[in-house]
Amino acid sequence: MGWRPRRARGTPLLLLLLLLLLWPVPGAGVLQGHIPGQPVTPHWVLDGQPWRTVSLEEPVSKPDMGLVALEAEGQELLLELEKNHRLLAPGYIETHYGPDGQPVVLAPNHTDHCHYQGRVRGFPDSWVVLCTCSGMSGLITLSRNASYYLRPWPPRGSKDFSTHEIFRMEQLLTWKGTCGHRDPGNKAGMTSLPGGPQSRGRREARRTRKYLELYIVADHTLFLTRHRNLNHTKQRLLEVANYVDQLLRTLDIQVALTGLEVWTERDRSRVTQDANATLWAFLQWRRGLWAQRPHDSAQLLTGRAFQGATVGLAPVEGMCRAESSGGVSTDHSELPIGAAATMAHEIGHSLGLSHDPDGCCVEAAAESGGCVMAAATGHPFPRVFSACSRRQLRAFFRKGGGACLSNAPDPGLPVPPALCGNGFVEAGEECDCGPGQECRDLCCFAHNCSLRPGAQCAHGDCCVRCLLKPAGALCRQAMGDCDLPEFCTGTSSHCPPDVYLLDGSPCARGSGYCWDGACPTLEQQCQQLWGPGSHPAPEACFQVVNSAGDAHGNCGQDSEGHFLPCAGRDALCGKLQCQGGKPSLLAPHMVPVDSTVHLDGQEVTCRGALALPSAQLDLLGLGLVEPGTQCGPRMVCQSRRCRKNAFQELQRCLTACHSHGVCNSNHNCHCAPGWAPPFCDKPGFGGSMDSGPVQAENHDTFLLAMLLSVLLPLLPGAGLAWCCYRLPGAHLQRCSWGCRRDPACSGPKDGPHRDHPLGGVHPMELGPTATGQPWPLDPENSHEPSSHPEKPLPAVSPDPQADQVQMPRSCLW
């Protein structure tokens, strides 16, 4: 009798129950239930007391830096942690709502938090992101193939935080969400959760980077899923922000959280299972928020599940735009890194990044996390942005997008007392290079945040080798037609805030208007989609195709996701219609859709763009004409409508500039060279009150430019006199009509040697004098026959030893 495995009674039922427990719950994403890990008790290693461990049960303050010892699978690990000092911006606030619906705004110390980043000693490719608010929780990555998650066990709510568990990320299964409508029908929709973001080096104060001032909102459903615990909900948002910061650092973008908000009583904007409707309702609410609390981007994190497998949505290239700088994401994972990866992905779309096509992500394999802009969210812990994403980001910045990211968080906002060592230069500090143990700044004393002897500065784009750059040194070049340059002031180490041309300023040689710092034109948008050979289709294409109100031609969607047909006057603001070109690397996941219309008895091809099903749900606005695009004389596209805009603010500003300058986004004059701000009505160097002085330290250069402007008109006359003086054998004669060569004073019959630098010299004539009066004839040099013929000049012959001509004595006046 053969051996057969024994099967316990009820096994099928137990397996079914187990699958039901492990099957993903919409909106939760990560499999619910306890995944067994290895018990571990991490300990702080106190500075000054080597290897004396302190249990987490003991009260320990939240140090700026510290070491944590723990064991994972029999291996001793020493975590080198540093508080993320720049996570919360100066002036950071927290908002929730009381029972009466009134907002309650708190301004906690923006440096007193418990969110860390770091590495594992002895593992060069490691990275760590930890929260130490209640026990310890977070990701520990040793290498591409070894990632762990640490968390308290028993879970939060218990008063015993001394016991934790650590497990490999491969043990955790997660929901494989995509950007399409496809619902999984089997376990193929499940995937292992790999390791997380890539490690980064110590922050370099002098390195130029962008700053994303972020505002995060938790909706009412998320508050309920956190058991109505306000502190737990806020900590969830802070953990997400810490991960988003880690991910965006790979693009040289630093997150500064300006505020978080929890909708404790009810949703302040409509939140439904329709991602599109939820997004536009939130963006409408966000406009009111921005007026009270300026920020660069607002992100809504919801506890609801969107229809299908959608986990996030954001407008393409919406960053810094009043109507579209934001996004929505579902909190689809038990672990905060899942929501953070989705949020970073949607922020990427706001920055003009599309999904990575196949073969684009070579920086990280899928099993080790992949890249952030992957179309599917089956790998919720991506390591980096791909080279394709970086290329798209550079293109976005080159055309003027994301102008608001150039400005660091406003240090003038009300903040708690300064804390030396937090990485922010605050009131009373000359510099701040972070905690003293790791400060390597040669310009700054870490212990008291003061400059070293002889140092003028320590940080900033206008600081080099501890010295301020001179006033007028360029610190930020203009990016695109609608940007303006900024210059060092000579008194500050920081470049002045970025400003750009005021909305409505003409750009692209008059074919467009500046809008939010960019110059959107149909030509530029066609070439972005279909390459350099593409151009806008005739207006008839827009009129016919966009009147259909379908996926191929429309003026956007309503709150229910239905396509809207374009009215006749709005046709140029719907789906972009082009001709020529081919798919561009800057717009993967887009396929051309050609339509044919009849125009003047001929067939005309109109090319639109349609997103592939795998890309369309979290990319809002793909293939549509960008806001601010010119659609008629003094008319621009706004909210898919062609609206007349008198640009009255621009006209008022230009009037004040006396026709000698342009207007910037602060409604101040940016003067042309030769005119001085603020009103461009007096001589000066150009620039504006906001740009910093334009070469103010180089007065000689300015005087030289003014001198040249006077002397340049005289150069032709001076050149003529020189030529007449140097021409071979040229007797110049004064006559009633000017000056001409005298044949008697000419050189060889065949002219100069053909290889001489002068080549063939042609006779030159000058017209009458400036006064119009003829010059008096000189009887000695007139053309009348002379009774005393001149002595003949010697013949000129080329020098066989040199490639030059022997020049005769010059003719004089």
Swiss-Prot record:
Q: PROSITE patterns per the record?
A: ADAM_MEPRO, DISINTEGRIN_1, DISINTEGRIN_2, EGF_2, EGF_3, ZINC_PROTEASE
Topological domains on the Cytoplasmic side lie at 723-813
Domain EGF-like residue range list: 649-681
Topology versus the membrane: Single-pass type I membrane protein
- Record GO cellular component, one term: membrane
Ranges for domain Peptidase M12B come to 210-409
Please tell me whether the keyword Zinc is annotated for this protein: yes
Residues that coordinate or bind Zn(2+) = 133, 345, 349, 355
The record's listing under InterPro entries reads:
ADAM_Cys-rich, Disintegrin_CS, Disintegrin_dom, Disintegrin_dom_sf, EGF-like_dom, MetalloPept_cat_dom_sf, Peptidase_M12B, Peptidase_M12B_N
- Note the SS bond partners: 320-404, 360-388, 361-371, 475-495, 653-663, 657-669, 671-680
Q: Which residues form the Disintegrin domain?
A: 417-503
Chain segments annotated as transmembrane: 702-722
> Quick one: a GO biological-process term for this protein?
proteolysis
Per the UniProt topology annotation, the Extracellular ranges are: 30-701
Question: According to the UniProt entry, what is the EC number of this protein?
Answer: 3.4.24.-
Q: Which PANTHER family does the UniProt record give?
A: ADAM A DISINTEGRIN AND METALLOPROTEASE DOMAIN, DISINTEGRIN AND METALLOPROTEINASE DOMAIN-CONTAINING PROTEIN 33
Domain comment text? The conserved cysteine present in the cysteine-switch motif binds the catalytic zinc ion, thus inhibiting the enzyme. The dissociation of the cysteine from the zinc ion upon the activation-peptide release activates the enzyme.
- Record's protein name: Disintegrin and metalloproteinase domain-containing protein 33
User: What is the species listed in this Swiss-Prot or TrEMBL entry?
Assistant: Homo sapiens
Q: Provide the gene name from the record.
A: ADAM33
